[in-house]
From Swiss-Prot:
Organism of derivation: Nitratidesulfovibrio vulgaris (strain ATCC 29579 / DSM 644 / CCUG 34227 / NCIMB 8303 / VKM B-1760 / Hildenborough) (Desulfovibrio vulgaris)
Temperature section of the record: Optimum temperature is 51 degrees Celsius.
Signal peptide from the UniProt entry: none
Protein name (Swiss-Prot/TrEMBL): Formate dehydrogenase 2 subunit beta (cytochrome c-553)
Binding site for [4Fe-4S] cluster 1: 12, 15, 18, 160
Length: 219
């Protein structure tokens, strides 16, 4: 049975523990960044940050400042278009693991031409893949494939202190998502699940997706 994540943003405090744990587990170096007037750091996904917590600050109709936090990562699509696009250029550059549902960029992705690698990245409806300028490989969340294959949770899920993130069999996560949604609606009437049928990373949002991030949802 394929796996799935549930990311309940109503519980997220933007501690960024998931973001840091991901870097540590994948042994990725620190990024040198500059203050841009936002708490979001780094400003975007990059080859050294496969997961980031996005910050969206706005003022509601009552003049109250509202924060919306969005832990962004690859959605591990049920039907990943990135795999199809990559296969047309270099078969096996991107694959989907049948057992877990993880969408993975392999070492063959370094053989993609710059134009083909760009096409793979631009095919993603969630703007996830990045191209490592040093290795030329496509980089993105790999569902902690090594950990999951060994029966462990992804490191971001294990690290999360608030229960924002959950991981398990897809059917179990769908059931948990519906349960969490029912609870969230008692506090957030506009709460909803995003692109449930199309992805393996199910987001529960308290408000419209536009209040989180441009690519928070596709449908």
């Amino acid at each position: 049975m394929p796996k799935a994540f549930l990311i309940d943003t109503t519980r997220c405090t933007a501690c960024r523990g998931c973001q840091l744990a991901c870097k540590e587990w994948h042994d990725l170096p620190a990024n040198v960044t500059k203050q841009r007037g936002s708490h979001q750091n780094p400003p975007d996904l990059n080859p050294n940050n496969l997961k980031i917590v996005r910050f969206n600050e706005r003022m509601n109709e009552k003049g109250v400042v509202i924060w919306n936090f969005f832990p962004d990562q690859c959605r591990h699509c049920v039907t990943p278009v990135c795999v199809d696009v990559a296969d047309m250029a270099v078969p096996g550059a991107m694959i989907k693991d049948k057992k877990t549902g993880a969408v993975l960029a392999t070492e063959k992705s370094a053989k993609l031409s710059p134009a083909d690698a760009k096409a793979v990245a631009e095919a993603c409806p969630y703007n996830i893949p990045r191209i490592d300028p040093k290795t030329k490989r496509i980089t993105k969340c790999d569902m902690c494939f090594d950990r999951v294959s060994a029966g462990m949770q992804p490191i971001c899920v294990k690290t999360c202190p608030t229960g924002t993130m959950a991981f398990g069999e897809r059917d179990e996560m769908l059931a948990l998502a519906e349960k969490r949604l029912a609870d969230a609606k008692t506090r957030f009437p506009k709460a909803h699940l995003v692109d449930v049928e199309d992805v393996s990373v199910i987001y529960l949002l308290a408000e419209e997706k536009e209040h989180y991030y441009e690519y928070a949802g596709f449908m």
